[in-house]
């Protein structure tokens, strides 16, 4: 039985957020919505600029990271951050349409969020 990719990502218990090369959020699964509501009291993120979900001081790093992905100098990025009740590991992976940078998928692996 084949499961299409959208249904697979929709049902992951890992927050999954995709953005285009201009930082616009193009996909967020249910767990992603729950995490952003719990951590940032943020809702309706689809179509918004993902940099709004990050601290202002990290936006320069995001700009640099996306540029490195465009130039294919990096194939992923990750970091660990404190969240209420524990830690979360955030993993960013670029994706391409042929040779052209098409965006980033971000996975948030939680150690304690419910």
Residue positions per predicted region:
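Sensory modules in modular signal-transduction proteins
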Residues: 1-30, 37
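PAS-family sensory/regulatory domains
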Residues: 41-57
């Amino acid at each position: 039985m084949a499961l299409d990719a959208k249904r697979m990502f929709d049902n992951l218990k890992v927050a999954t957020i995709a953005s285009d090369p201009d930082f616009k959020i193009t996909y967020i699964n249910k767990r992603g919505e729950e995490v952003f509501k719990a951590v940032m009291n943020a809702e309706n993120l689809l179509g918004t600029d993902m940099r709004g979900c990050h601290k202002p001081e990290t936006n320069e790093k995001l700009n640099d990271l996306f540029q490195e992905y465009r130039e294919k100098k990096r194939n992923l990025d990750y970091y660990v951050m404190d969240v209420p009740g524990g830690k979360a590991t955030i993993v960013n992976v670029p994706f391409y349409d042929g040779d052209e940078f098409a965006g980033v998928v971000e996975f948030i692996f939680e150690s304690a969020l419910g």
